[in-house]
Amino acid sequence: MPIALPHDAKAGPTKAEVRSVLLGKLDLGADDHFAEVGSCTGAVTIEAARRAGRVTALERKADRLEVTEQNLAANEDSLAAEIDLRNAEAPAGLPDDADALFLGGSRNFESVLDHAVDTAVDRIVMNVSRLEVAGRATEAFRERDILEEVVQFQVSHGYELAGATSFNSDNPVYMLVGGASGSDDGSDGDDADDGDRAEATQ
């Protein structure tokens, strides 16, 4: 069932097709504790809360957290998880017992990965849209021995043009997938998370 997103934020929601791939990689179950860095509109938060037993979502911007809360309320009848929304930075605001982790932007991503390694997060997914950040993120995953795969994909939507069908293309998304069970450490991150999130949602 599609989710309802009546409220919006500047960066916009993660696109439905991207969410589908993301959820497939995370493979959330009823016993899982899912943690999210950068909830924004709450699109991923809502999808995860339909599948996981617990959801902890961080959003450092109060106005975006309010949008997350409003969109969660619009979908409350379909949510199964216990949800904890935190107006906090990562990694400081992250739980220590997450089974799965999603990074929706690149702010402090190396420190977040260090936390994931220290707490042995089983499934980690990070989305970025800028090539340079994707390169740095790939190296950071490799340095910590947590990289399983990098997926690059692009979605196009058809529209009618002169009685035929043409396509508008969304920006490409680079999805880094890994797991930190039994891995080692690293250091600091990139501050320009909004650029990745804004482009990945277009």
Label each region the model flagged.
Residues 163-202:
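Core SAM-dependent methyltransferase catalytic element
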Residues 54-59:
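Conserved SAM-binding motif I beta-strand of class I
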Residues 117, 121-174:
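C-terminal substrate-binding/active-site "lid" region of AdoMet-derived donor-dependent transferases
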Residues 1-30, 35, 40, 66-70, ...:
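Class I SAM-dependent transferase core
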Residues 41-52:
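Conserved SAM-binding loop of SAM-dependent methyltransferases across substrates and taxa
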Residues 63-100:
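S-adenosyl-L-methionine
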Residues 108-116:
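A short, conserved alpha-helix within the catalytic core of class I
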Residues 98-105, 123:
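Short SAM/SAH-binding signature in class I
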